[in-house]
Amino acid sequence: MPIIKLQVETQAITAEVAADDTSRSRGLMFRESLPRNHGMLFVFQEASQYCFWMKNTPLPLTIAFINARGEVINLADMEPFALDTHCALAPAKYALEMEQGWFKRHQLGAGSKLRGLPSP
């Protein structure tokens, strides 16, 4: 998967990009760890209220759903291996998974702006 640098307000991160059906379906499944300030960015062709789950994912994660303007719509904490879904509250073009608590530690949430997002 391609790797890019993103800016979430003042925080620099490195993100693997999942931009096709295969990479989006696999996501962070089976990963045992994430390096500090690393995550996975899911890129979609169309904006929609996408939902995610944690099947086969041993890491606790927080997901940020992001609109086409690069603004965080909402966050959701996701527990390892949980099969319940976490959905965007409004149409999203992107979703960013980071280690659980990363956004809270950096005081980021709904309305926070991302820079460096790729075009779908």
Describe each region flagged by the PLM:
Residues 1-120:
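Compact, glycine-rich, soluble single-domain proteins
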